[in-house]
Amino acid sequence: MRKLDRVDMQLVKILSENSRLTYRELADILNTTRQRIARRIDKLKKLGIIRKFTIIPDIDKLGYMYAIVLIKSKVPSDADKVISEISDIEYVKSVEKGVGRYNIIVRLLLPKDIKDAENLISEFLQRIKNAENVEVILISEVRKFEII
């Protein structure tokens, strides 16, 4: 992978905080030209570093909450089976594979209504066949959320 310079990293950080800034505004912040910003963004997109420009909605105001599900597969090689069992569920918003006490971390987007959330969690847990241990944590408040 090609090494990014300081300006590329700053550009990615700034855009992760506000992707609506114009090339002119970015150029002013980074003390460069609009054309250089355009070239850098094109390069970052081609390298796959910038995958898309998006928003981060306030899920609380939309009537939702997150739950984090920690899963330990029966054996490490079963992790991919577990991931395939759950990845196509609509309210599963991220699935990460890792190393540690739990080897799969899942983020669910659930309605705030506790009965509806409970039903979806039960449905989710029934889909998991190759897990030794599962722990569900309902997120009551997001205090900090940064991409980079």
From Swiss-Prot:
Provide the protein name.
Answer: Uncharacterized HTH-type transcriptional regulator PH0061
Question: In which residue ranges does the UniProt entry place its DNA-binding region annotation?
Answer: 23-42
- What InterPro entries does this protein map onto? AsnC-type_HTH_dom, Dimeric_a/b-barrel, HTH-Siroheme_Decarb, Tscrpt_reg_AsnC-like, Tscrpt_reg_HTH_AsnC-type_CS, WH-like_DNA-bd_sf, WH_DNA-bd_sf
Source species, domain of life: Archaea
The UniProt keywords, alphabetically, are:
DNA-binding, Transcription, Transcription regulation
Gene Ontology terms, MF aspect: sequence-specific DNA binding
Record PROSITE patterns: HTH_ASNC_1 (PS00519), HTH_ASNC_2 (PS50956)
SUPFAM superfamilies assigned to the protein according to its UniProt record, in alphabetical order:
Dimeric alpha+beta barrel, Winged helix' DNA-binding domain
Q: Which organism is it from?
A: Pyrococcus horikoshii (strain ATCC 700860 / DSM 12428 / JCM 9974 / NBRC 100139 / OT-3)
Q: Which Pfam family name is an example for this entry? A: HTH_24
Report the residue ranges that make up the HTH asnC-type domain in this protein: 4-65
